[in-house]
Amino acid sequence: MFIKIIKSWIIELISPFVFLRFKNIFELKKYLKANEKYTGICASVYNRYMFIRGSYIGITCEFKNQPYFPHGILGIFISDDTIIGNNAVIFQQVTIGSDRLSDTDNLGSPIIKDNSYIGAGAKIIGNVTIGNNCRIGANAIVYKDVPDNSVAVASPMRIIIKENKMDNRFFVKRYNGDIKFYENGYFHKK
């Protein structure tokens, strides 16, 4: 018990220095994955950060660039080995999970391609591919592939294929009237 308390204090003491070195949690994750460091002080700081927020973003999952979380990473679950493309927007309480049961037809982790928009509470489970420019509706449960330029809604899942490419950038109107959108890891002025 005493050792656990000491370890917890050490992690709390070292956390600010780790974040000074890596700037944000995603840079720390990138470092841990690149160097295959799944244990140690930096991994403990990363895991504690996720635990405090009720989230899990697997160290071995891959982001093409940093996704945008409009409500922060509270309650987000992204399993190991998931691949998420450029310009993803992921709302709160989303689960992007692998299917690891031996008797499943869907064994593996999801692949989410570029310009995806994943609504609050959505669940994407197993070895599925979400195509480019797709939207996943709030509370949708996705268990099969979604083609490019589609919307997946409800449970049981329905897929609506769109004729034209959808603009899934996340827009924000600021108090001064400026409109900005999130793309390639940054907000840009419209």
Each predicted region: which residue ranges?
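Terminal amphipathic alpha-helical/low-complexity segments used for targeting or macromolecular assembly
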Residues: M1-G54, N164-K190
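Left-handed beta-helix
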Residues: R53, I59, K64-N65, P70-H71, ...
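Conserved beta-strand-loop-alpha-helix hinge in the C-terminal portion
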Residues: S150-A152, P156-F170
